[in-house]
Amino acid sequence: MKTSVIFVLIVLNLMWSGEAQEVARTYCGSHLADTLADLCFGVVKRGGAQYAPYFWQKAYLGSRGKRGVVDECCFRPCTLDVLASYCG
């Protein structure tokens, strides 16, 4: 009985801690651009305008300045929260 209670508590603890952690991964190239577009502007429709307006391009700099989303999320893994912080 005591062993099964401890086992259940360990399993519940592992399940809970797994949900609390966001996975960090790398975003490079078109995957980075598409993910940023989804986070900042909603779903990107293919077949529409080929280029984003100038004011949208400036929004990619966001509040993070010139530090660089590529430096932070392509060269090193980052979370979606970090990536979303680049939205203007």
Swiss-Prot record:
Signal peptide range: 1-18
Record-level Gene Ontology MF annotations: growth factor activity; hormone activity
Prodomain positions: 47-65
Principal subcellular localisation of the protein: secreted
The protein's assembly and partners: Heterodimer of a B chain and an A chain linked by two disulfide bonds.
Note: Silk worm has two kinds of PTTH: 4K-PTTH and 22K-PTTH; there are many forms of 4K-PTTH.
Family: Belongs to the insulin family.
Protein name, per record: Bombyxin B-8
